[in-house]
Amino acid sequence: MHELLRVSPGFSLASIDSSATPGFVGGKKEGAASLAAGATELAELQEKLFAESRFGGTRSVLLVLQAMDTAGKGGIVDHVLGEANPQGIQAFSFKAPTEEERAHDFLWRIRPHLPQPGYIGVFDRSHYEDVLIHRVRGFSAPEVIEERYGIIADFERELVAAGTTIIKVMLHISADEQKARLRERLDRPDKNWKYNPGDVDERQHWDAYQEAYQIALTRTSTPDAPWYVVPADHKWYARWAVQGLLLDALRTLDPQWPAADYDVDAEKERLAAT
């Protein structure tokens, strides 16, 4: 899964088919079944990681989700991590920065939401907004944005050195698929609340966003924190693929149940005597 989706030298976002399902044979029904099958293992690995931290473990996982609007970032959190114990999940959605946040460097608002040891953190949007929308809409000067690519790479290298495994995912949808999803939000009263008129404004800059993503992905995909581009026209596939990336990362970490720091047999005897 990693190698199929990883951003590597020569990567071209324009060449990625957003309706493809690399690494999976089957359709929506089979994808849902595979997702359900992986949920149990993911939940157990997450709980082991959390338990490990209660006994001095320092490791954590950070899942960074970036995408155009309607690509399904929220659905990833619900469907991929929905079976995991919520006490070990830290999810945060970054909105437009506040006046206070704008008064500091762009990573200032990110650091408080980094996952603590034992947690899986999820960023719905992230520090990458400062080289994506800022580039497209001219919110920062070109030389400032250029400097940020290096700052981001250093920041992520620092996190990895401190014990955080970073999984950066771009959910890649087509302009036509986004249009269909926006139309669905308008057609269905139960989805009207999800619609934001500003999403149509951003569609006018589609090509510029694709260019900004191409630059950001290639400039900041490093051995420490590689990017993965997940075709997301099919929501079921995107969820399956992200679950696979998380499972691969957690299997590599291989967290273990902590050994009891007390005499188990003696405690059984004490309990039996009560």
Identify what each model region corresponds to.
Residues 73, 100-103, 129-135, 161, ...:
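Switch/connector loops and helix/strand junctions flanking conserved nucleotide-binding motifs
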Residues 133-151, 159-211, 258-265, 272:
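A glycine- and Lys/Arg-enriched "phosphate-lid" helix/loop adjacent to the NTP-binding pocket
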Residues 56-63, 117-118, 225-226:
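Pre-Walker A (Motif I) flank of P-loop NTPase domains
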Residues 1-41:
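Charged, amphipathic alpha-helical linker segments immediately N-terminal to NTP-binding catalytic cores
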Residues 211-214, 218-274:
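NTP-dependent small-molecule kinase module
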Residues 63-81:
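Glycine-rich phosphate-binding P-loop
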Residues 44-54:
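Pre-Walker A adenine-sensing motif
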Residues 23-37, 89-147:
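Conserved nucleotide-sensing/catalytic segment adjacent to the nucleotide-binding pocket
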